[in-house]
């Protein structure tokens, strides 16, 4: 049973009846064929005596099969076959050639020019009706297949527009980069063609505590994007009840209580959430099924910040742990990202790894403003495609001095 609110494709396809067009200069033949078909109430019969009007008549009646005489005045029957096959609206209609003679060479030429069948007139009634039904069924299937394909393309275009609007909405919610002060941020978000559920943000909780977070909802599409936006708004507004947003493990536990899968269309999300204390220069963090954040100091030391927690929404009674790391004096960089930033198939088939991403980010970037863009271009070149299979999201937090 189709989901509520959705119409099955079979219900929107056009029902086509069987329509026969006979092209023959002899009215007696037309009368005979009409008599053969008169008891077949589901077959509509049309007759064209003038071969010069055959194409126009076919355009008017839209036959599902054409019966065409081979020997007619003014136009040779084989030439008329060429005309039918050259017309863009008529070229696929099944065409049965009628002839008074059984000639192998003529048959071969007719088939070579595009005829679908060959009958010596007049055939037995049962045989004629069987061939009409057989060829019409094939053509009707072709029409409905083409119609279904067009409907699918329209649906895909509508979905693409919907996803583009959703992506624009997600981007509009992301915070402005911080370009001055002791904490600075840069980020890039490149949605995939299917639009995943990536979202991120940062804000000052109070004068000393700076929150940073990135989440990734499972799956793709508008549903995933809406859930990520809901979670983002909760974090930005700090609207989880009885939760100290300076304590990451409590934040994840409260998110898990608020966003259980059974209440959100079986969707869950992973998250990395951290809080920097600018007085102590300590980052407290917790991750729920999410890739580690990478902390790179000015001395080139790298730390993977990750905790062994379950993703958000999977189990109601999950407990969460947090970790802590000190940021030494001097410049340091923290990279928070989704798995789309490194789980990228190379053109040769292997997948890029977290360790390779870490090695890529380790050197001080020659142009910090273009660092994340440069990474994305690198992944595009490695993948061999302009768009990656998953959302690419990366947030860089720089600690100055």
Label each PLM-derived region with a short phrase.
Residues 13-19, 27-46:
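Two-component/phosphorelay signaling modules centered on CheY-like receiver
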Residues 24, 69, 99:
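Active-site residues of response regulator receiver
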Residues 61-67, 71-72:
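Active-site beta3 strand of CheY-like receiver
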Residues 73, 82, 91, 99, ...:
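The feature encodes the CheY-like receiver
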Residues 148-335, 384-401:
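… and, occasionally, acidic/histidine-rich disordered N-termini of signaling adaptors
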Residues 328-335, 341-401:
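C-terminal catalytic subdomain
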């Amino acid at each position: 049973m189709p989901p509520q609110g959705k119409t099955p494709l079979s219900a929107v396809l056009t029902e086509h009846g069987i329509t026969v067009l006979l092209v023959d200069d002899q009215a007696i033949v037309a009368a005979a064929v009409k008599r053969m078909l008169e008891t077949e109430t589901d077959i509509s019969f049309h007759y064209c005596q003038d071969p010069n009007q055959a194409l126009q008549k076919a355009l008017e009646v839209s036959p599902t099969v054409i019966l065409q005489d081979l020997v007619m005045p003014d136009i040779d029957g084989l030439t008329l076959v060429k005309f039918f096959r050259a017309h863009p609206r008529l070229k696929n209609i099944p065409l049965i050639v009628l002839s008074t003679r059984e000639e192998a060479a003529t048959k071969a030429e007719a088939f070579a020019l595009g005829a679908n069948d060959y009958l010596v007139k007049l055939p037995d009634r049962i045989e004629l009706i069987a061939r009409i039904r057989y060829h019409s069924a094939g053509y009707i299937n072709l029409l409905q297949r083409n119609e279904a394909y067009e409907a699918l393309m329209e649906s895909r275009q509508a979905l693409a527009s919907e996803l583009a609007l959703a992506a624009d909405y997600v981007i509009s919610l992301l915070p402005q980069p911080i370009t001055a002060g002791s904490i600075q941020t840069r980020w890039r978000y490149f949605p995939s063609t299917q639009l995943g559920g990536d979202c991120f943000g940062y804000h000052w909780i109070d004068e000393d505590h700076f929150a940073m977070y990135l989440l990734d909802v499972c799956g793709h599409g508008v549903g995933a994007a809406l859930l990520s936006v809901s979670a983002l708004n909760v974090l930005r507004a700090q609207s989880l009840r009885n939760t100290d947003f300076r304590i990451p493990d409590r934040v994840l536990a409260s998110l898990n209580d608020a966003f259980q899968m059974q209440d959100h269309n079986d969707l869950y999300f992973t998250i990395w959430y951290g809080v920097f204390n600018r007085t102590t220069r300590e980052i407290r963090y917790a991750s729920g099924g999410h890739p580690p954040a990478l902390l790179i100091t000015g001395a080139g030391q790298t730390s993977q910040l990750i905790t062994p927690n379950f993703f958000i929404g999977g189990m109601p009674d999950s407990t969460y742990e947090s970790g802590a790391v000190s940021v030494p004096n001097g410049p340091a960089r923290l990279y928070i990202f989704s798995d789309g930033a490194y789980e990228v198939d190379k053109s040769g088939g292997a997948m890029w790894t977290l360790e390779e991403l870490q090695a890529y980010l380790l050197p001080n970037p020659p142009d910090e403003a273009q660092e994340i863009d440069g990474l994305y271009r690198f992944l595009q070149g490695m993948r061999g495609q302009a768009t990656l299979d998953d959302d690419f999201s990366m947030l860089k937090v720089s600690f100055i001095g």
